[in-house]
Swiss-Prot record:
Residue stretch of the organelle transit peptide: 1-15
Species the sequence originates in: Arabidopsis thaliana
InterPro entries: AKR, Aldo-Keto_reductase, Aldo/ket_reductase_CS, NADP_OxRdtase_dom, NADP_OxRdtase_dom_sf
Gene name in the database record: PLR1
The enzyme's E.C. designation: 1.1.1.65
Designated name of the protein: Pyridoxal reductase, chloroplastic
Amino acid sequence: MALTLSTTKTFTNINCSNNTSNITTFKPLKLPLFWPWQKVKMGPLSVSPMGFGTWAWGNQLLWGYQTSMDDQLQQAFELALENGINLFDTADSYGTGRLNGQSERLLGKFIKESQGLKGKQNEVVVATKFAAYPWRLTSGQFVNACRASLDRLQIDQLGIGQLHWSTASYAPLQELVLWDGLVQMYEKGLVRAVGVSNYGPQQLVKIHDYLKTRGVPLCSAQVQFSLLSMGKEQLEIKSICDELGIRLISYSPLGLGMLTGKYSSSKLPTGPRSLLFRQILPGLEPLLLALSEIAKKRGKTMPQVAINWCICKGTVPIPGIKSVRHVEDNLGALGWKLTNDEQLQLEYAAKESPKSMIQNIFQTR
């Protein structure tokens, strides 16, 4: 399912540096220079070193989605494909109210209609997440949720089927049922690989061991991971992933937009995000200053620097995209590496900043 591209193709919007300094702050990893056609392994899959998230597609409450945006979303998707991105993350719960599932529907439509994928739709790696709704009480119901996602996506097989969150803290018996559902999806060939989202260190090890006894490898673990989310628990999750051969997918690599440099205490986003920004932004001055300094020195933007840091840590970040401009900017995070000194500068600045991202309430221990 990996997207195969000719290395002679001209790629736009990607700046390149020959700097390949070693990384010493985390467990050393052998990494490519992050060109999108130099895929990284994610279980049995080969994916671009950065994917794109589609949380905003259909979300009116937080991201202000309107159906009039669909054309620009499709243009953004096409540009991502043209530049070698083949990993797209979604969820069966993405979309608000009557638009529930809209993200999957749009992604499926764009894949089917893509001019660059004529007869090759299966080369896109779709990773979707299944919500642990309280009415999904049997493994069969969880498998049916997977089939419903396949219908909305108009595809026969998922790249990665993911459990959206753990129910261990409030419904431990349901948790075992959902794990069995993941196994059945894999055994029935509905998914090429399975993953989890919002799993803390303890539950991550438990589900890995459970799946191993069932003969199913755990491909990926998706958590909030960024310069704003690099606390003790997140680093422990990353260490476990490295040890067990699980690829960490980092969502919200830009901290819901706080690391873009677009906002300040006097310039806040509209909607519910403004409440969070009002709490956190005033304490981010050291980190934002470091991002700005490195971006200016490198001829990059602050988002490109923040995303590149995630890639340097061996994760696959999935920034959200809502426009061609977002894709163009995010693609500039590829084709170069932060030096070790630059990474240390950012990490020190993050620690010096008195505020960090609030932990997702769905993440368990």
